[in-house]
From Swiss-Prot:
The keyword Signal applies. It comes from the Eukaryota. Disulfide bonds: none annotated. This is Probable beta-glucosidase btgE. It is found in: Secreted, Cell wall. It catalyses: Hydrolysis of terminal, non-reducing beta-D-glucosyl residues with release of beta-D-glucose. Gene3D superfamilies: Glycosidases.
């Protein structure tokens, strides 16, 4: 599907038709076909393996103060309501040395200790509530289950877990927090897992995957080490404006002097380990936990390219689920520091408008937003038009792209797409939008359907990928894309051109002179940025490991943020 040979390049006309027929259709066609009902799950990594050893000792539950129904001394405008509180229990991890067997009968009894784990309070109704202050003193270091929250839009999400970065093949042994049934409730526990990192990269160990039908705030446990010190949970007056609101009240601490080093929370391994952030409402009952990983290639040196306009961003995990809000906001914010002015999103799913929009506003980025057309055709995309019109944060939007290679993928014909673009433009205008609207297709589709499409769009949108032309090397990528610009301008006279997808893969099989590698990717991207970077959107932020391999096995490996 990637760009075509130029009609004017007579010297290579003999091979152009073969390239159009064979090379322009590849795994990119299924950019958003990631759900189980639309596409098979990503292939499992045969080199990864992991075993889990559960070594758990149950301890007393963490105590959380519960306000009584008697009037509080705090003066508020509403009556203080009794709090309905829940908490995660405190669990002490006891690791049995390798080769030894646990002897539960000989284990000494341990006195109950109250530890400063965060208080999780559920407010069933609106009102003003007071949580009294609490002070605790801890004299020994203990690994416990903390708690954190994250907001998830509707859909399938992967969150939590422990992230580790290794520089070579490494076996990592670390604790992770999870929940398991305990009678009619659930209890947080600390488990240990052994994970084999097959090569250098970043891995997420033991994340949780869940499905939420609507936008939800979940609470989930995280491993934490409580060190000796005095911890205070200050008095809090909370005004709750919606029903079933969950509030996490943390402790703040001052560490006590100590003459002995604090025991590490993980087995000594040449790796750095941190808890993965995330935020959401009551813990969904459909959650499942399995040790897994999300490897990525080591980052190449940054700062090689400048002068670029935009970057595509997809809010999906390596498994095809939706990323949490915290991850989306931090990743999008990085684009501004890399010199980008725009972020392009393809659809409205996974909180693309709300979460990416919030990140763009905070970071000072503009957005190129999209209406994605799938196999269901234009009728199935109307709800996205409605969602965008209701969102209506037009001060963030530079361009709306209706359809991404939908003609190339045979999801609709040119006349149907043109009619849908005109209809969508009317809806956006009625909602207050006065900016540009277009679609995006490879150059061969524009050449064949310009008569139908030119009148419907305000600017010509094209996906130009020099890799899929076998006679173009990485060093020639910039000149090739610039020539495609000239050809496209001749299709719709008087209208500008924007390159909405361009880049170069870093892994896969060679396509003639087009060779995928980290080095060639860096060369190609710099060449494109030098020629047409100010009117190009680079593809893509990360590798898309949830995709099928596609033509030349490159479809998953276009991540290029390290080059900027």
């Amino acid at each position: 599907m990637r760009g075509a040979f130029l009609a004017t390049a007579a010297a290579i006309a003999g091979t152009a038709m073969a390239d159009i027929a064979h090379m322009r259709r590849h795994g990119h066609d299924s950019f958003h076909q990631r759900r189980a009902v639309e596409q098979p799950a990503p292939e499992a990594d045969a080199t990864c393996g992991c075993t889990t050893e559960v070594v758990t000792s149950w301890g007393p539950p963490t105590l959380i103060p519960i306000a009584t129904s008697s009037p509080s001394s705090t003066v508020t405008s509403e009556v203080v309501t009794t709090l309905h509180s829940t908490s995660y229990s405190t669990v002490t991890l006891v690791v049995t040395p390798s080769g030894a067997s646990p002897n539960r009968e000989s284990a000494p009894a341990t006195p109950a200790v109250t530890l400063p784990t965060p208080g999780v309070t559920s407010f069933s109704t609106t009102g003003t509530y007071t949580i009294p202050a609490t002070t605790l003193t801890v004299t020994h270091s203990t690994t416990v289950c903390g708690a954190t929250t994250t907001e998830l839009p509707s859909g399938t999400h992967t969150y939590g877990g422990v992230t580790t970065v290794v520089d070579r093949h490494t076996t990592v042994v670390c604790p992770y927090a999870t929940v398991e049934p305990s009678g009619s409730t659930v209890t947080s526990v600390i488990r240990t897992t052994t994970y084999v990192c097959p090569s250098a990269g970043t891995y997420t160990i033991a994340p949780t995957t869940t499905y939420v039908p609507t936008s939800t705030v979940i609470v989930y446990p995280t491993p934490a080490t409580i060190t000796p010190g005095t911890y205070t949970q200050p008095a809090q007056t909370i005004t709750v404006t919606r029903d079933n609101y969950i509030y996490v009240c943390p402790f703040t601490g001052q560490q006590l002097p100590t003459t002995a080093p604090v025991a590490p929370a993980t087995t000594a391994v040449p790796a750095t380990t941190t808890a993965v952030p995330a935020t959401t409402t009551a813990v969904p009952a459909t959650s499942s936990v399995a040790p897994s990983s999300s490897p990525s290639k080591p980052a190449a040196p940054s700062g090689a390219v400048s002068g670029q306009m935009g970057m595509t961003y997809s809010p999906y995990t390596n498994e095809g689920g939706c990323k949490d809000k915290a991850s989306i906001i931090s990743e999008v914010a990085l684009l501004k520091s890399k010199g980008f002015t725009h972020v392009r999103v393809y659809s409205t799913d996974c909180g693309s408008l709300e979460f990416i929009g919030e990140a763009a506003r905070t970071s000072g980025l503009r957005m190129i937003i999209g209406v994605f057309i799938k196999q269901s055709g234009v009728a199935g995309a109307q709800d996205q038009v409605t969602a965008i019109s209701k969102w209506a944060q037009w001060d963030l939007v530079s361009l709306i792209v209706v359809g991404n290679e939908s003609i190339q993928n045979h999801f609709c014909d040119a006349s149907t797409l043109a009619g849908f673009i005109v209809s969508a433009k009317q809806s956006f205008k009625a909602a207050g939008y006065s900016g540009q609207v277009t679609t995006t297709e490879p150059i061969n589709v524009w050449q064949a359907n310009g008569d139908a499409l030119c009148g419907a769009v305000d600017i010509i949108g094209a996906n130009i990928h020099p890799f899929f032309n076998a006679d173009v090397s990485a060093a020639e990528a910039g000149k090739f894309v610039a020539q495609e610009f000239k050809t496209l301008k001749g299709i719709c006279p008087g209208k500008d051109v924007i390159n909405l997808e361009t880049g170069w893969p870093h892994s896969g099989e060679a396509n003639g002179k087009a060779i995928p590698s980290r080095e060639e990717q860096a060369i190609a991207i710099k060449a494109i940025a030098d020629e047409v970077g100010s009117m190009s959107v680079f593809f893509s932020y990360f590798d898309d490991l949830w995709k099928q391999p596609g033509a030349f096995g490159v479809e998953r490996y276009w991540g290029c943020i390290e080059n900027f």
